[in-house]
């Protein structure tokens, strides 16, 4: 057998192995999310009085941006596939990013009806991009782009709240696991409580503008509008379901990314979860594209554990 034929067979076997591994990872994550939901469903419900049930219904374990708890620790696993550059010039392949994000929030009362909400994120990534330094698309591991955020929230009434702030994103992930750019993200939003339904239901539209301002000049400039027209519905027994809880609706105003044919990304995004105790909530989120002219992702899943104290 010639050496050329051996090399071809070896590459085919390696490629098949990677495809099998990626399929196993996707199945494993899906099973993990299903198992978490089953655990929440089967978890015994502690009997309580009507007064306690009413209090629990309005409790917040960190899922409501405009009602931040004093302290929050969040652990989130994030699985995403998106178009990336292939091994040959002009070709496109799927790039998988797996993230374990560690978040800490702290809220301060500035004055009656005024709150300062602080946030920091540390993403730990595993990603398989194809590049000159990683031509085989092996998984690379490390820290992604960390960020800090500050927002001022003003509660106008029990029904209305408004807020504004900004997030600073540092290029700690370097050129491979991050954007290579410093970014600033102004944020503005409002909250309207749906007391007609229950105390845990609300509409919460948020708008963000992500723009790069420094960093690696060879990297693509970032400039995109992000929308989250969140509708949260409180359900019995501490369950909740949110439509568009993440700012995944995007309009790209910056440099085009791999696979882009237009400026709009419109997904279907839903999160379902349960407050498993007065100070903890567990949720699962799924995002799939409807319009993918600006391909932010092909598939997104997130599992969050929020613990407040």
Model-derived segments and their meaning:
Residues 1-58:
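Cleavable N-terminal export/targeting peptides
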Residues 50-215, 221-309:
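Transmembrane beta-barrel domains of Gram-negative outer membranes and organellar outer membranes
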């Amino acid at each position: 057998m010639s050496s050329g034929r051996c090399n071809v067979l070896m590459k085919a076997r390696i490629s098949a192995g990677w495809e099998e591994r990626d399929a196993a990872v996707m199945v494993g994550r899906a099973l993990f999310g299903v198992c978490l939901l089953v655990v929440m469903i089967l978890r015994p419900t502690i009997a309580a009085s009507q007064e306690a049930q009413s209090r629990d219904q309005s409790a917040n374990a960190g899922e409501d941006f405009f009602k931040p708890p004093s302290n929050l620790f969040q652990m989130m696993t994030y699985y995403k596939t998106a178009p990336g550059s292939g091994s040959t010039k002009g070709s496109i392949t799927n790039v998988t990013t797996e993230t374990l994000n560690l978040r800490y929030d702290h809220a301060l009362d500035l004055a009656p009806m005024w709150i300062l909400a602080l946030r920091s994120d540390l993403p730990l990534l595993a990603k398989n991009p194809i590049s000159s330094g990683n031509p085989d698309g092996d998984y690379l591991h490390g820290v992604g782009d960390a960020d800090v955020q500050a927002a001022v929230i003003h509660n106008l009434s029990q029904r209305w709240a408004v807020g504004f702030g900004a997030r600073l994103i540092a290029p700690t992930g370097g050129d491979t696991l991050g954007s290579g750019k410093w970014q600033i993200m102004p944020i503005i939003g409002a909250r309207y409580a749906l007391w007609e339904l229950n105390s845990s239901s609300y509409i919460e539209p948020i708008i963000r503008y992500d723009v790069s301002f420094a960093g690696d000049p060879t990297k693509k400039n970032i400039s995109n509008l992000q929308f989250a027209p969140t509708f949260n519905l409180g359900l019995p027994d501490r369950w909740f379901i949110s439509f568009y809880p993440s700012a995944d609706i995007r309009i790209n105003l910056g440099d085009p990314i791999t696979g882009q044919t237009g400026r709009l990304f419109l997904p279907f995004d839903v999160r379902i979860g349960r407050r498993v105790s007065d100070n903890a909530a567990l949720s699962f989120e799924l995002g799939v594209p409807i319009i993918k002219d600006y391909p932010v992702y092909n598939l997104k899943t997130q599992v969050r554990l929020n613990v407040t104290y």
